[in-house]
C-alpha cells in the first residue's frame, strides 16, 4: 500500500502554512514559584524569562490555597474522574464547583465542560438544534469556538458589525418577532480587548424577543465585585440568558462552563454532545478551581493590582 499520496497532501498543507507565516513553534516553559517569572528551554538549557503572554492573568495557578486544596483532593479522590457525567464522572468536587459557579453568576445552575472552547461549541450547537428555525446574530469579532458552534448545524445567521448596536438592530428588525433569535457576543473581545456593549444588547434583546449568550472568558475573575465579570460589574447578570466562562484564565486551572437557569442547563446537559460523550474534569482540578473562585470572590487585591499595572504600562508606553 502506497501512503505517499497522503504524505504529499500533509506536506503541501504545512508548506502553505509556512509560506503564510502561520506555522507555530512551541516554547517549552518551566514555571517558577513567583509568577510571571519562568524558565524557557533553549539549546538543552533553561534560561530565565519574564512571561508577557500568559492567560494565567492573576497567577492563580501558583496560588497556595488552590495548590493546598488540590493536594488534599488528590489524596482523597485520586487522579482521574473515572467516567463521563452520565456514569461515574459526577464526583462531589465537580458538583460543588457547579454550585459555586451558579452562585457566582447569580444563576440557578451551572454546567462544567472540559474547556471553554468545548463549552461554546457544544452549547451553541445544542441551542440551534433545540430552537428550531432559529437565527443567530453574532458579533464579527467573536471567538473561533463561537464560530465553530454556529457552523455546527448550518443555521441561518447574521454577522453584525463589532459593537454596532445600530447594525444589530437593523438586522434584528428583519426577523419576525416570534422566530427564535440568539444574540451571541463577548464581554471582552480577545481580538482587540474591547468591552462589549452588554447594556445595548440587553435592551435590544428585550425589544426584539431575543435569547442572549455572552462569553465572559476574559472577564471572569478579573472584573466585578466578586470576580463574576463585566455582567456583574454592570449589574446585568439577571438580564442575560447564558453566561459562559472559563476556569483556565484568571482562575488558573482548566475547564469551561455555562451558567443559566435550571431549564436551560437541563436541556444542554441532555443534548450537548461535547458535554455528554467525554470524561469529566478530574476531582483535583475541580477542587482547585473552587479554591480559586473562593479566593477571588473575597480578595480583590490581585485584580486591582493587575489593572493598576496595565494603566502604568500603558502610560509608560505612550511616553515613548
Give residue ranges: language-model regions.
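Active-site PLP attachment segment
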Residues: 226, 232-267
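Conserved PLP-anchoring active-site segment centered on the Schiff-base-forming lysine
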Residues: 124-144
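Conserved PLP-dependent catalytic core of the aminotransferase class-I/II
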Residues: 196, 290-320
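Substrate-binding/gating loop at the entrance of the active-site cleft, primarily
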Residues: 115, 137-153
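Conserved N-terminal alpha-helix of the aminotransferase class I/II PLP-enzyme fold
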Residues: 67-115
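Active-site phosphate-binding strand-loop segment of PLP-dependent enzymes
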Residues: 56, 158, 162-214
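N-terminal "arm"/small-domain region of PLP-dependent enzymes with the aminotransferase-like
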Residues: 2, 12, 16-77, 179, ...
Amino acid at each position: 500500500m502506497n501512503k505517499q499520496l497522503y504524505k504529499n497532501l500533509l506536506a503541501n498543507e504545512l508548506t502553505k502554512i509556512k509560506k503564510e507565516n502561520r506555522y507555530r513553534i512551541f516554547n517549552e516553559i518551566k514555571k517558577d514559584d513567583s509568577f510571571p517569572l519562568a524558565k524557557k528551554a533553549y539549546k538543552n538549557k533553561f534560561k530565565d524569562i519574564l512571561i508577557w503572554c500568559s492567560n494565567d492573568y492573576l497567577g492563580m495557578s501558583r496560588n497556595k490555597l488552590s495548590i493546598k486544596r488540590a493536594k488534599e483532593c488528590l489524596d482523597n479522590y485520586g487522579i482521574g474522574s473515572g467516567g463521563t457525567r452520565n456514569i461515574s464522572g459526577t464526583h462531589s468536587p465537580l458538583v460543588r464547583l457547579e454550585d459555586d459557579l451558579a452562585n457566582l453568576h447569580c444563576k440557578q445552575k451551572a454546567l462544567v465542560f472540559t474547556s471553554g472552547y468545548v463549552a461554546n461549541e457544544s452549547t451553541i450547537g445544542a441551542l440551534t438544534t433545540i430552537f428550531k428555525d432559529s437565527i443567530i446574530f453574532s458579533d464579527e469579532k467573536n471567538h473561533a469556538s463561537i464560530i465553530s458552534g454556529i457552523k455546527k448545524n448550518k443555521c441561518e445567521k447574521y454577522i453584525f458589525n463589532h459593537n454596532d448596536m445600530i447594525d444589530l438592530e437593523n438586522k434584528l428588525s428583519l426577523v419576525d418577532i416570534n422566530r427564535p433569535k440568539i444574540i451571541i457576543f463577548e464581554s471582552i473581545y480577545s481580538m482587540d480587548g474591547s468591552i462589549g456593549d452588554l447594556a445595548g444588547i440587553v435592551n435590544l434583546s428585550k425589544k426584539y424577543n431575543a435569547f442572549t449568550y455572552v462569553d465572559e472568558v476574559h472577564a471572569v475573575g478579573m472584573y466585578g465585585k466578586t470576580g463574576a465579570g463585566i455582567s456583574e460589574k454592570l449589574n446585568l447578570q439577571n438580564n442575560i440568558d447564558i453566561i459562559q466562562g472559563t476556569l483556565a484564565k484568571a482562575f488558573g486551572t482548566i475547564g469551561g462552563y455555562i451558567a443559566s437557569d435550571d431549564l436551560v442547563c437541563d436541556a444542554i446537559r441532555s443534548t450537548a454532545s461535547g458535554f455528554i460523550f467525554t470524561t469529566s474534569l478530574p476531582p483535583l482540578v475541580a477542587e482547585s478551581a473552587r479554591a480559586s473562585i473562593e479566593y477571588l470572590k473575597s480578595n480583590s487585591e490581585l485584580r486591582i493590582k493587575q489593572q493598576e499595572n496595565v494603566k502604568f504600562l500603558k502610560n509608560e508606553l505612550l511616553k515613548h
